[in-house]
Amino acid sequence: MVCGLLLYVFDISTNVYTTYKHLEDDTDENKVISVIEESNKGKLNRETGSGDKSLYLSRDYNIDLFKGYDELPLSELEFNYVPNEIYYVWCYNRTIEFKNYLSIMAAWKLMRPDSITFYTKYSITDNNEHYNFWLSELLTSVSGFKMEKLPPSWDRDEHGCGIWFALAVLEDVGGIYFSTDFFPLKSLRFIRKNKFTVATTKNANEISFISSIPKSERLKSFIKLYKNKEVRPALVPGLHYCEKLFNVTMTTIENNLCIHLEKIIPVQIMHLNSTFGSLARKIMYGDSQQIKVQPILPGSIPKIVHMVWFGFKTMNFAMYLCLRSILTVVNPDKVYIHGDGQLHGKYLQKLKKDNRVIFVYREIPRHVFGKQIIYMQHRSDIIRADILLKYGGIYSDWDVIWLKPIDELISKGYDTILNFDHMPRPGYPDSINLGVLMSKPGAHFIKRWQDSLVNYRSRDFFFNAIELPYKTFERYPHTVHVESHLQVMCYFLKCHPTFHPDFRNYNVPQPFDWTKDVYSIHFTHPDPPAYANESALQNSTGMFADIGNFILKQHFEYD
């Protein structure tokens, strides 16, 4: 008997794993066997799963465990002089940045070393970091990566912590040293077949990499030259150069063997049209192609809306407008209100007459991955991840008013749809607001975001709410469509559409046409005075008053 089966089929002709998941009852072993047979015959439609319509297909981007890795011929095992060990030395009392992570991952995937030893002068960690989690990612994704403190006996700090210790290691045991901002543009595995290879920046001020056998006379000679600042091609045969990449759009480095990275973040490489961009994407995402968002799962996002409410509360007029906008503008099949059922009041009683409004009892989540949830808003985050992963649909906060239908948007087939926040966060190029979030059930982004909550910080409101979602987007950008018109964020009645070039200036409102530019408006804090009650709305003017009156004019059967 085969229960709840997730079946992976490998296509020899394309070297691609395909995932087939049964939608109904997987107890029928004959159906499973038929899937394998049909796939082997090439008869199963890879887009629809037709041949057996009770099956659907999804391309799982994480099945290929070796994405971005160089393949190794057997000849790589022979005629190597240099030990297959890579060394880095980190002299700063802070954690690493993305450029350092990219350097180390490039070494791991392209050089395929036995191990990478990362020597540090200080005990570093990224436990309290907001953006730079790259060290933790190395420690959990690179099996051969290890960290070691510089030995207390090391007494040559007058020369600098970094290269001099590395030279001492190579002189003793051999191997390969890479600068912590080094990035190869071509395969460097050939250097292990030479007893000594070195590359520097063009002025020879900085060593890019050194590969050496232990006790090498050429290495000893080079060390003397480097101390005396006499490194030049005439004295160092076969000397290679690595250029510094001051700007990621530089094209003069296309034919270089290697480069040194300056400040860089993942979003800069997602669509970068250059040799470096292609290689960086291969290392980061396992595919050199520019990031393109395509559906992984079949069908479209379900036209159902999820909302969350806990606690004894009389539904106020602002909340009424929000839910009414969902029922009349979005016009969903169902609206599920998840919570403890303590929401009440005349406005709720009116809206409950619509049988599309359904209450789903749920206990208040108090922990996630064993960590206490303090903020009520974070409890909503936990629930929306769980609900959307299970059922899909549209999540909407209680301070979101919908302005136009979403049918065309969800018909495009994207697995997940969201948009950036207007609020700048230290160290972040952008942040993400999930007050409006659309997703198919089982969407990859939602699962990865839920997984990221293992890093939940109980007392850090913004980290959990808008920073972690961005980190998920940064790591899996191909799984999510960023729709800048999905919601306009407002704060203290000033609105900041993310499609406006100055949207990050939250002290000044940016203009937009609410009647046609956006799907929804998210007024956050405070509630507009016009929404205090019906009388206030009737006597108010301005954009928020116009929006409120627009919602009241929408046809509702139970008015």
Model-derived regions, located:
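Glycosyltransferase-associated regions of secretory-pathway enzymes
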Residues: 1-163, 180-380, 398-559
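Small-residue hinge/turn detector
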Residues: 162-175, 381-391
